[in-house]
Amino acid sequence: VVKGRVVDAVGAPIAGAAVSIDTVTVTTDARGGYAFVGAPLGAAIVVLADGYAAGLATSAERVADVVLVPEAVAAETITVHGEAPPPAQGAGKLARADLERLPGAGNDAIKALEAMPGVVAAPMPLADTGLAIRGSSPQDSKILVDDFEIPMLYHVIGFRSIVPAEAIEQLDYIPGGFDVAFGRASSGIVNVTTRPGGETAQQAEVSSSDGGVLAQGKLAHGSYMLAFRRSVIDQLLPALLPDNLDLALTTVPRYYDQQLRIDYAPSRRWALRLSSLGSDDVLELYTTKTEAADKRLYDRTRFLRVTAAARYHDGPWTANLALSGIAQQTVFERGVMQHLTVASPGVTARAELGRTFGDAAGLHDVTWRLGGEVAVSRSSLDLALPQDRREGEPARPDDPMDTSATYHGAIWSPDFAAWTALGASLGDRLRLTAGVRFDAFERTHDFAVQPRGELAIKLAPRITARLSAGAYRRPPEYQTELLAPDLQAERATQLVGGVTVEPRDGLKLQSSLYYTDRSRLITRLGDQLTNDGRGTTYGAEWLATLHEGRWFGWASYAYSRSTRVDLPGGASRLFDYDQPHNLNLAVSYRFGRWQLGGRFRLYSGLPQTPVMSAVFDSDANLYVPVYGAVNSERAPMHHELDLRLDRQWRWGPAKMTYFLDIQNVYLNQSTLGYIYSFDYQQRGAFKALPIVPSAGLRGEF
C-alpha cells in the first residue's frame, strides 16, 4: 500500500486533489489523504489540484507530505517534498504506524505519548482526565479529537485510552507554544486526527484488554469508517479470580468505545465530514462479600460527541466550518452518604478563514487567518462529597460520612473566542508568525487578551531554529472550581526556543528549552478557592527519531523543574507532577513477516508529602494525620524494559497480525508511594505492577 497526504504551504490538507500513479488516479479525502493498493514502488506520483501548481513525488511505503504551492505564487511548476513543520518548537507528530510500533504501549495509541519528552511518566496512569505535561496538572492541558475537546482520555481501569489506534490517522503533541486557534489551556495540547475510511478490507481485533471491529469503505464521492470496541476484562477476570477471594465485584471494569466517520467531497472545492465519538465506563464493587451497602462504590462515566464539519478551498482561500455537540454524564456513589451526579450537554461552533497572498508589501509567502469559536455548556450538578483535593494538598483521612461539599443546581458556561494570525517570510531564512487570541469567559466575567508569536530562522538547508512567546489562559472549570464564580482564569506566559536538525532523510534531531511563568493559580485559603498562587516551570528536552528501511528508532530525554507558591509570602514547593528526569530509548526492526522491538525507560519518581504523626478525632472516630512539608519527599526512580513482537501472515483471503507487548519484563517493582495504617503509625510501600503483558490478534478481510 502506497499512501500519503497532500497539503498546502501552511500544512493544511488539500481535499479533492487528483493523485496519479501510472494510469491509476485517486482523489484525496477531507484530510488530504490518499492510498494506492498494489502500486509499484519507485514510480512517479503526480498531484494536481485547482489553484495549485502540480506536485511530484516518488511512491514508497512511507511517502512524505506533498506540499503544493498556489499558482499565484509560482510562475512555473514547483515541487516541494518533505514533512510539514511541527506546529511549535518541541512539538511532535506521531503517525499511526509509529504509534503501533512503539514497544510498551500495548497497541494503545495514546499511551505511546508517554515516550514524548515533556509528558510526565508513571507506572500507573496519573489521571483519567488527561496528561500531565511539563510538570503541570492534567487539567492544565487539553485533549482534542479533530479540534474538539473530549472530557476524558483513559478508561476507568486506566490502562486503555478511549480512542482506538485503528481509527487514528495522526497524533499531534504540542507541549507548549501552541497556535492562537487553540485556547482554554495553560500548558499543552494533544490533538488526535481521526482517519477517513479507505479501500482496504474490514478489520477485527481481540486482545487481552478488549475486542473491536472496524468497517470501512468507499461511497460515491466519499468514504465511511465505523469502529466499535468493548472490554473483555469483565469476562475474563471472574474466571481468573479464586472463589475464596474476599472481594465482590458487582460489575468488573467494563467499557465501550464507538467511532463513526463519513466523508463526502461534492466537488474539488468542498469536503464535508460527519463524525461521532463515544465512550461508556462502569465500575461497581463492594469491599467484601458480606458487608452492606455502606461499603458500596459505583462509578459510571459516559459521553457522546457528534461533529459536522465542512472545508472549502479555492485558490488562495481556505475556510473551515464545524459544529459539534456533546452529551456527557458522570455518576459516582460511595456508601450511603456520598454521591455525585453531573450531566453536561454542550455545543461548540468553530469557523476559520485563511488566505495566502504570495508576495505582499515586500514580504514573501504571506498567510493570514481569522477565526472564532462559541462554546456553550450547561452542567447540572447534585453532589455531597468531601472537599476535593487541590494540587499539593495531601490526602484527607478516609471518612465515608464526610459530605462537607454539597450543591444542587445548574451552571451555564458560555465562552466566546476570536483569533487572528499573520505569517510572512522575511527573505529566504526568516519567517515570522504573529497573532492574538481573545477569550471571554462569561460565567466568571473574565476577558483575556493573549498575544502569541514565533520567529523561525533557517540556519542551514537542514537546520532550523525557532523561538516563540505567548500568553495562555485556563478558565476555572475543574471540579468544584465551577462553584466559585469569583475565580479568574489561571495565567501562563511561555517562552520556547530550540533547534531542529535533519542530517539526512529519515533522521530528525530536535532540542528545546522552555520557561513558563504561572500566575493567578487557583489554591485553597480556608474553605474558599482563590487566585493567589504563582508558579515557575523550566526545562530542556531532546528528541531523535529514525525511519530507515526496516529500522525504527526513538530516543528522548527531558529535564524539568516545576515549583509554585500557594499564598503570598509562602514558601516555594514542588508541583505534584514535578519530574526532573525522563529518558526513553526505543528501537524496532522488521525482518520478513516479523517485527521485534524494545524500549528502555528511566524516570524520576513523583513528589510525596510525608506523615509525621496523627491525632485521634473522637467525633469522627478516626485518626487525622499531621503532615510534614508539602512534597518534601520523592518516590524512587523507576526503570523498566519493554519488549514487543509482531508477526504477519496470510490466512486465506485475510491478512492476520499477532502482537505480544510486555511491559517491565525484568519485574522491577518500584515504589510509587506509601499506604498508611489506620492510626498512621506504620506505612507500607505501594508498588508498581511487576509485569504488564498484552497480546492481541488482528484480521483484515
PLM regions and their residue ranges:
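Surface-exposed extracellular loop regions of Gram-negative outer-membrane beta-barrel proteins
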Residues: L383-E391, I457, P461-V496, L513-T530, ...
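C-terminal beta-signal and adjacent terminal beta-strands/loops
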Residues: R601-L622, P636-E640, D646-F701
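Gram-negative outer-membrane beta-barrel transporters
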Residues: S425-R431, Y514-D517, N531-M612
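Flexible loop and strand-edge segments within Gram-negative outer membrane beta-barrel domains
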Residues: A271-D314, A319, L323-T348, E481
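Periplasmic N-terminal accessory/gating domains of Gram-negative outer-membrane beta-barrel systems
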Residues: D29-G33, G51-G55, R62-V67, T77-D179, ...
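Transmembrane beta-barrel wall of Gram-negative outer-membrane proteins
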Residues: S209-R230, L247-V282, Y298-N320, F357-D359, ...
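Membrane-embedded beta-barrel scaffold of Gram-negative outer-membrane proteins
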Residues: N320-S324, T330, K458, R466, ...
